[in-house]
Amino acid sequence: MPRAAPNSINATLNLSSSLGKTVHLPAPAATIFVADPTIADYQAPSNRTIFVFGKKFGRTSLFALDENGEALAELHVVVTQPIADLRAMLRDQVGDYPIHVSYTPRGAILSGTAPNAEVVDIAKRVTEQFLGDGAPIVNNIKVAGSLQVNLSVRVAEVSRSGLKALGINLSAFGQFGNFKVGVLNRGAGLGSATGSGGTAEIGFDNDAVSVGAVLDALAKEHIASVLAEPNLTAMSGETASFLAGGEFPIPVLQENGQTSVEFRRFGVSLEFVPTVLDNNLINIHVKPEVSELSLQGAVQVNGIAVPAVSTRRADTVVELASGQSFVIGGLIRRNVNNDISAFPWLGRIPILGALFRSSSFQKEESELVILVTPYIVRPGSNPNQMSAPTDRMAPALGTPPRARAAISTDAPSVKGDLGFIIE
């Protein structure tokens, strides 16, 4: 740090972008430099006058030294955008909502209340574009009503060979990457794989066809297996995640020759980010994944067998109303088995044994079907309305027959329309 000259200037210089101020030095300057010329710069009409102007949002420092190396001026330059212009732009883009913006030496602060998360996101993006890349923004805008989204997910493994045997076709009209997305039209049913009738297509459900009921029926016939049924609730705009599985160790060879252990996750995982839009529409970024340990591709590390991981995942963004469903499918796994049938003892005779044995290849295909249903929910204000499934059950075992006959309780039932509590 250079030694300060007599009557040196040490101050904070506040500038707006594309505007400047004049600084008069107490003595002629021999050297002038700016720490970050991309934020602010200068022009010197004379050796005692500096014109400092802002270029973009940020903070930097300006130093002016005399011929002896002593500091004539040490300025902390803070460059901001005209806050009145930003406030006017916010009103034009998001409407007349109580959203406030203020500047700090390090960035901008957004505060106030918005009707939904979409307005919050627009206000943040407008501020970022106005201030420029890299400008720190603190978002303190609150969403009115504390909207939350409950995501009901069913992850099922469906046997494709069983579906073909029953003449069921789970098809879709559109394919994106390795998974398919379609629409369940009103009146559509389960058609054959080759027929031209209605099919249970992978996509949105408009209450005419319940894919969940189809999965239940297939599970009873051992054609489908439900792997997980997570229910997650998250604030609008926040991230929620779920994992049903475990972790397995992986030996990792270090540079010094020693071996450390890292753990990798496997199983059924889900991550989603819901955003509540206008008219109760929900924008969902959902990333389901199913992974399992596999001997195919396994390796040996220092004599330790490390299994491979077979992974099927999808990543998509959709918009739908509360209570509607969509399905992700097309994630297929294939297994090929070679079955050998032979007559006892005779099948082992050289050359002639081939006449007494036969081999057949069996190809098994299974499809991963992920059913997702979002609901807009709010916290319950009355805890007495919340109950567990066993709250209305009365024990019958361990009581005398007469007392058992006297037990009376109301049959369990759901509360509210469709099982939801309406306040």
UniProtKB/Swiss-Prot annotation:
It comes from the Bacteria. Belongs to the bacterial secretin family. PANTHER family: PROBABLE GENERAL SECRETION PATHWAY PROTEIN D, TYPE IV PILIATION SYSTEM PROTEIN DR_0774-RELATED. Keywords: Plasmid, Transport. This is Uncharacterized protein y4xJ. Residues 75-145 form the BON domain. One of its GO terms (cellular component) is type II protein secretion system complex. Involved in the secretion of an unknown compound. InterPro entries: Bact_Secretion_Sys_Channel, BON_dom, GspD/PilQ, T2SS-T3SS_pil_N, T2SS/T3SS_dom, Transpt-assoc_nodulatn_dom_bac. One of its GO terms (biological process) is protein secretion.
